[in-house]
Amino acid sequence: MVRLKNRYLMTEVIWHDNEKSTQLSDSWLFQFISNEVKEKLGELTYEAFKKTLKIIYVNPDTNIFIIRVSFEYYKSLWTALTLITSYYGVPIYFRMVHVGGSIRLCQKAAIKIFGKQISVYDKNKILRNEKGETIDNNNNKNEEPSIKMDSDDDENGGGDDGEDNDSEMKD
């Protein structure tokens, strides 16, 4: 029995004009990619891997999608996606986030990438709190006077008790 080897390409669609961007969907992506591959690489190349081309996952909020293609043709698809520069006059760019042999590897890569982005949002929240800004339930920004007391260390013995506090600084 022959094992079919596939590659899963996790790709991000970057719209350079957000006002003219389109909502991603399975059918739109499949049609658009099919037409662009025919135009960029030729109909013969497209026909060679058309049967193995499948959209596995689409997230319109993050503009991320996972596409499956046969191992033999994943470099051709990667090349075609790289060559796409516009969608009806709107500048567009496909960024290859991860190439893997299974969906599980793509999921792990997505968790790793989005985990870093989530920590950036937490950092912004911390910076807002340091400035004394708060956001209420209606997403209104309120500025409160920030009171920073440096004398807390002096009350607790100055924080100079000879112990290293590096264990508290771990990520």
Curated annotation (Swiss-Prot):
Molecular-function GO term, any one: ribonuclease P activity
Q: Provide the protein's localization.
A: Nucleus, Nucleolus
Q: Name one GO cellular component term.
A: ribonuclease MRP complex
- One Pfam family, please name it: RNase_P_Rpp14
Please note every region of biased composition (Basic and acidic residues).
Answer: 141-150
Specify residue ranges for compositional bias: Acidic residues: 151-171
Q: Which reaction does it catalyse?
A: Endonucleolytic cleavage of RNA, removing 5'-extranucleotides from tRNA precursor
Q: Which InterPro entries match?
A: Pop5/Rpp14/Rnp2-like (IPR002759), Rnp2-like_sf (IPR038085)
Q: What is its EC number?
A: 3.1.26.5
Region annotation Disordered: where it falls in the sequence: 131-171
Q: Is the keyword Nucleus assigned to this protein?
A: yes
Function, please? Component of ribonuclease P, a protein complex that generates mature tRNA molecules by cleaving their 5'-ends. Also a component of RNase MRP.
Family of the protein in this entry: Belongs to the eukaryotic/archaeal RNase P protein component 2 family.
Name the PANTHER family on file: RIBONUCLEASE P PROTEIN SUBUNIT P14 (PTHR15441), RIBONUCLEASE P_MRP PROTEIN SUBUNIT POP5 (PTHR15441:SF2)
Q: What is this protein called?
A: Probable ribonuclease P/MRP protein subunit POP5
Q: Which organism is it from?
A: Dictyostelium discoideum
